[in-house]
Swiss-Prot record:
Residues 157-167 have a biased composition (Basic and acidic residues). It comes from Homo sapiens. Pfam families: TRH (PF05438). Residues 91-105, 168-178 have a biased composition (Acidic residues). This is Pro-thyrotropin-releasing hormone. Residues 69-79 have a biased composition (Polar residues). Hypothalamus. Expressed in the hair follicle epithelium (at protein level). Belongs to the TRH family. Residues 63-205, 220-242 are annotated as: Disordered. GO terms for biological process: adult walking behavior; cell-cell signaling; eating behavior; histamine metabolic process; hormone-mediated signaling pathway; negative regulation of glutamate secretion; positive regulation of gamma-aminobutyric acid secretion; positive regulation of insulin secretion. It is found in: Secreted. As a component of the hypothalamic-pituitary-thyroid axis, it controls the secretion of thyroid-stimulating hormone (TSH) and is involved in thyroid hormone synthesis regulation. It also operates as modulator of hair growth. It promotes hair-shaft elongation, prolongs the hair cycle growth phase (anagen) and antagonizes its termination (catagen) by TGFB2. It stimulates proliferation and inhibits apoptosis of hair matrix keratinocytes. The gene is TRH.
Amino acid sequence: MPGPWLLLALALTLNLTGVPGGRAQPEAAQQEAVTAAEHPGLDDFLRQVERLLFLRENIQRLQGDQGEHSASQIFQSDWLSKRQHPGKREEEEEEGVEEEEEEEGGAVGPHKRQHPGRREDEASWSVDVTQHKRQHPGRRSPWLAYAVPKRQHPGRRLADPKAQRSWEEEEEEEEREEDLMPEKRQHPGKRALGGPCGPQGAYGQAGLLLGLLDDLSRSQGAEEKRQHPGRRAAWVREPLEE
């Protein structure tokens, strides 16, 4: 590409000479040589300008390519997050929050990456354990005492445990009470009259007979242990009838 000064010099030479043909050719060559000698760095300057323009175009092109690449990366990350499981996204967000808390100095909770329902179950279980921990059996809730036993007959549940005792046990208890307190549940006047001594302190035949009958009934009751009460009553009646 010829320089502008060179073109101007050629135009001036042609205009000034005004002579056709080869008369003006040696003069034009001389003028070109003079201009080249006067401006030796003009061509170099133009070449540098061209290089700078070329570099500028390359830089702009590279910037455009980088912008397109970054936009494609953003689109790809959005696409990946869109096609990802929602639970994994939540876990990643929780991880980011936990990392921020660790950086700020906050302690991470014990329920890291745990199902919310399990957290509630464990919390209620821990509350129950703390409530019943080291507790006296008598101080526990009263409804536990009335709780229905597991796999038990409904009639047996409602029945009184004292009423389930056998008649033999009841007879044994009655005999023990009679041995300890033979005159229990008896009128005090009858005890005084039925004793070996009368109300005036005299011993009679009736008092002796009653004392003997009491002794016999006690001895027979001891021998006839665990016997039906009706049979025992029959043995007691025999000496009376005689």
